[in-house]
Amino acid sequence: MSQANLSETLFKPRFKHPETSTLVRRFSAGKPQAMQSALSGNHVDHWYRLINRLMWIWRGVTPQEILDVQARIVMSEAERTDPELFDTVIGYRGGNWIFEWAKEAMQWQQKAGQEADPLLSGRHWLHASNLYSIAAYPHIKGDELAEQAQALANRAYEEAAQRLPGSLRELEFTIPGGSPITGFLHMPKGDGPFPTVLMCGGLDSLQTDYYNLYENYFSPLGIAMLTIDMPSIGFSSKWTLNQDTSLLHQHALRHLENVPWVDHTRVAAFGFRFGANIAVRLGYLEPQRLKAVACLGPVVHGLLVDPLHQGRVPEMYLDVLASRLGMHDASDEALRVELNRYSLKTQGLLGRRCPTPMLSGFWKDDPFSPEEESRLITSSSADGKLLEIPFNPVYRNFDHALRQIARWINHRFG
């Protein structure tokens, strides 16, 4: 089936689809405050979703494109679940978040199909993949339209990978007691086996969101990157996140000694946000398989155990946590009790000495991940490095931090 036909088949006009903000039915205790975070985006009035401009621009979406799509959503007069929230238009139609971002993606998909230059066509496919991923954001389980957008993001990513430099292989990993999962191994030019970074993304992202990380930071150093979806989304959608947060990534890590393109003696883990929970956990459980662990804005303890901290983060993020845990109808109190078990300190790991070298980067006053979170990680490591990232200029400092982290990992590979 052609990509255009697939889009038409998946996105038939229907108005019965549940609207994203209604899928998690937690008891909300109050009105969220405005919030700004480099890594997770801004919570601004009248939007349910966090507007994550830094990460979207970093992935290749232009600021103008973001504003254009937002404007179409704002201007819509269609019925909304909450009249106060722009991005709650009901049904797949003009003004609906998924509709508008998928419509933008389809334009780039069409450009890709018409472009004769393979490299440029690959860029267009990658752009379409990023836009489909934003359409599906924040990837809440049971969001039918979002799951269709995820499927299109993955298809577009596969098309892009065939045309862009280097090579990409889809690897299937068998997980005992459940469905296998698929990961993408991105490899630079040259002969392998390559030192490899296992990417552990955030709870509100797909594994296809990190191509830029590979292309601009790891590939130039001759490092490959393996991505895996977080439990309950994408290729890992049949799994629910549980207290053994690193289960899927751990099985993938153990399998790498059987992958001929990977130098399994030189593997590191890199975690964004909750992905750092997985990466640090692996640092404790698999020190013989990991040369290093790096984290950015980690969520490993504070947010998971402190109700006041939880009260400072937006509803959307708590909805995402509840969704990953399969707690769509839980009270806030039940969610708090469960989240406490996901703290790596509560689990008896953080605070104990870990032989794996660990770097943790943080932004001052980050509502998701205060400085103490990163200090807890680095002070627990026999070879810890703390990296403070100045907030402004936000894009340049983010880029600089990623370059420092890539060099640090490369140095640990030896």
Swiss-Prot record:
Q: What is its EC number?
A: 3.1.1.1
Show the GO MF annotations. Answer: carboxylesterase activity
| Catalysed transformations (reactions) | a carboxylic ester + H2O = an alcohol + a carboxylate + H(+)
What SUPFAM superfamilies does the entry give? alpha/beta-Hydrolases
Q: Which UniProt keywords apply?
A: Hydrolase, Serine esterase
What top-tier enzyme class does this entry carry? hydrolase
By its UniProt entry, which InterPro entries does this protein fall under? AB_hydrolase_fold, FrsA, FrsA-like, FrsA_esterase
Q: Which Gene3D superfamilies match?
A: alpha/beta hydrolase (3.40.50.1820)
Which protein family is it in? Belongs to the FrsA family.
Q: What does this protein do?
A: Catalyzes the hydrolysis of esters.
This chain belongs to the protein called Esterase FrsA
Q: Which organism is it from?
A: Klebsiella pneumoniae (strain 342)
